[in-house]
Amino acid sequence: SSDWSSDVCSSDLRKVLNEIEEKKIHLKQVKRVGTLGVTHLEHDIAVEKGLYYYQGNDFASEIIFSVRRLTEPSKEHVDNNFSPLNDIQKEDFSKMTESIITYLKRCAAMIETNDYHRLDDVIVESVSLTNQLTALKKGELKRIQGQSGSTKVSMVYLNMVQEAQNVVSFTANLVKVSRKFQKE
């Protein structure tokens, strides 16, 4: 669920970490099969398509790693019964999560349907989300300077926001390279 106002339990986070591991394994298999496929292409095509293929794989791997880096510290925090996120953090991150999920679904549909005519809109959306996430980080840093709340909780929160920002950025790059792979 994208509602961070409800308490996240350790088993939910463990489930996410297990799913991340499954995605990592799947991506490694896809990369191996793709590597074999690239070797069967004509040299010039193999060079060009191979580059985009490997870049796409790298961006997909980075997305998976960012989700893991977002989840692991959160799980440790929950497992150690540290203070939960405060109401402002929960509300702000919950709103951003909804927007990011919508964005990710839009990007996935674009790649799955191989329809990139709205690519510019997706790029504009990624910049907007990145700017909003940067604003969340700045707001949190101001709260830390004002010494309101737990620094440990703030560090977990800042990590969550940073990794969410990475997911947005890597996804935009994945869509761009996917278009190049398909169209060029």
Predicted features along the sequence, with ranges:
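Cytosolic, long alpha-helical scaffolding segments
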Residues: 2-184
